[in-house]
Amino acid sequence: MRRLRILIFLLILSLLLPTAAIAQEPEDEERELLAKAIYACTGIVSFCDEWRLCIGEVLLNRVASPEFPDSLEEVIYADERYCGKVEGYFAAITPDKRAYAAADRLLAGERVMNDPRVLWQDEHLDGGVCKSLYDYRWGTIRFCY
């Protein structure tokens, strides 16, 4: 009986260990980071999907630009608008389905503005404007290059 319990324990352990030992894939980490950043900017308010895509597109443009860090994580943490001023804020974010959907669409190559020069989103005018979106609560946000 004791041997049977040990065998069952080892069998269960062998089934659990491989999944626990596998690290998160880089693509999954990038998806999670992008969804969190999109949600940090748009999750509190019901912005349209186009707005979510534009926010994410700016982040991906920054990663591709020589003016910014080379990784999504570094770009996000370099700007308080995404990670917040409070330590642990960004880590505690749980993106909603719409943020994940926007991240998935962007990582699959979809673009709304389709202009790699667009590196800023702000209510103030910074350079040329590629796209402006209006929300009655937040006003006009411009996506600039």
Task: List each model region and its residues.
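Bacterial N-terminal signal peptides that target proteins for export
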Residues: 1-8
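Bacterial N-terminal signal peptides
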Residues: 10-18
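Intrinsically disordered, low-complexity Ser/Thr/Pro-rich tracts
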Residues: 1, 17-23
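Bacterial extracytoplasmic/cell-wall-associated proteins, especially those involved in peptidoglycan
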Residues: 24-145
